[in-house]
C-alpha cells in the first residue's frame, strides 16, 4: 500500500514531465493575489517553479522571490528553471523563513497536501501584517463536453487509486482558519483562460498526477491505452484547452 506521504512526494519521479505539462496560473490571478509593492514573495510547495516563474516575470519584480519545496528532485528542476529565485528545502508545516519576512505566500495545486493545523500557524508567522495568503487551483473547464469526458478518465484513475489505498473524500478545496487566527476570511475570484495543447501534451498532463504515478505498471499501461484511445477519437491533434483558475485570498491581520 502506498501511504499518503509517498503519494505527496511521488511527483519528483516525473519532475521533468511535471514541469513540461503542468499549466501555470494566468498573470491576472497573481495580480489579484499579490499585494501592490510586495518586496518579498514566497511560493510554498513550489514544485518545479511554475508560479515562481510567474512571480519573477512581474513588473516590478519583487526584490526577493523564495521557493520552498520538500522534494529534492523537484527542487533541482526548480533551481535550474528559476535562476535568481531563492530555492529552499522545506514544507508548509515547517517554513524555513524568519517571522514576518514575506508580503505574500502563494500555494498552487498543493493546499490539499498540507496539514492546515500545522501549516496555517507557519504561514501566519512568516507573513507581515497586511500581507496575503493566496491559494490557487487551476483546473480544466468540464462545461465543455470533450473536457468533461477527458476529466472523467482522470477521475476514474484517481478514485480507483483512492479506493485501493484506503483514502476517501474529496480533495480539500476550501481554506478555513482555526478561531483566533489573524487572517481575514478568504475572498474568491475565478479567472478563465485557455491553453493550446497537442494530444501528446494532454496525455502527458494526465501522467503527472499522483493517482497515475503511483499505479502499478500494468494498471498505468492500461490507463495510458485508454487515454490514447480517447485522444485518437478526437477530430483534432491540437486544441485550445479551456481552464478555470480559482483563487482564494486572505490578508494577514494584526495579532
Which functions belong to the PLM regions below?
Residues 1-37:
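Conserved class I S-adenosyl-L-methionine
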Residues 44:
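Conserved beta-strand/loop positions that form the S-adenosyl-L-methionine
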Residues 40, 48-94:
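Class I SAM-dependent methyltransferase SAM/SAH-binding core
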Residues 93-104:
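A short acidic, Gly/Pro-enriched loop at the edge of an enzyme's catalytic core
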Residues 118-195:
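Conserved catalytic/acceptor-binding region of the Class I
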Residues 103-117:
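A short SAM/SAH-binding and catalytic strip from SAM-dependent methyltransferases
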Residues 172-255:
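Conserved Class I S-adenosyl-L-methionine
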Amino acid at each position: 500500500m502506498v501511504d499518503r506521504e509517498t503519494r505527496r512526494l511521488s511527483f519528483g519521479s516525473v519532475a521533468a514531465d511535471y514541469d513540461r505539462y503542468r499549466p501555470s496560473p494566468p498573470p491576472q490571478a497573481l495580480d489579484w493575489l499579490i499585494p501592490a509593492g510586495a518586496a518579498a514573495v514566497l511560493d510554498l510547495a513550489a514544485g518545479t517553479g511554475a508560479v515562481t516563474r510567474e512571480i519573477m516575470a512581474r513588473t516590478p519584480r519583487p526584490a526577493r522571490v523564495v521557493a520552498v519545496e520538500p522534494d529534492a528532485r523537484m527542487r533541482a528542476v526548480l533551481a535550474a528553471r528559476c535562476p535568481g529565485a531563492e530555492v529552499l528545502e522545506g514544507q508548509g508545516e515547517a517554513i524555513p523563513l524568519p517571522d514576518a519576512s514575506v508580503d505574500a505566500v502563494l500555494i498552487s495545486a498543493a493546499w490539499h497536501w498540507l496539514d492546515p493545523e500545522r501549516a496555517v500557524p507557519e504561514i501566519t508567522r512568516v507573513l507581515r501584517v497586511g500581507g496575503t495568503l493566496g491559494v490557487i487551483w487551476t483546473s480544466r473547464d468540464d462545461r465543455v463536453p470533450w473536457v468533461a469526458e477527458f476529466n472523467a478518465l482522470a477521475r476514474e484513475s484517481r478514485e480507483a487509486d483512492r479506493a485501493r489505498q484506503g483514502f476517501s473524500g474529496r480533495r480539500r478545496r476550501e481554506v478555513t482558519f482555526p478561531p483566533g487566527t489573524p487572517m481575514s476570511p478568504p475572498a474568491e475570484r475565478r479567472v478563465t483562460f485557455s491553453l493550446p495543447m497537442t494530444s501528446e501534451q494532454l496525455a502527458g498532463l494526465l501522467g503527472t498526477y499522483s493517482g497515475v504515478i503511483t499505479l502499478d505498471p500494468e494498471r498505468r499501461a492500461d490507463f495510458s491505452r485508454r487515454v490514447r484511445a480517447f485522444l485518437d477519437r478526437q477530430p483534432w491533434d491540437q486544441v485550445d484547452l479551456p481552464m478555470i483558475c480559482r483563487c482564494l485570498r486572505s490578508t494577514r491581520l494584526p495579532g
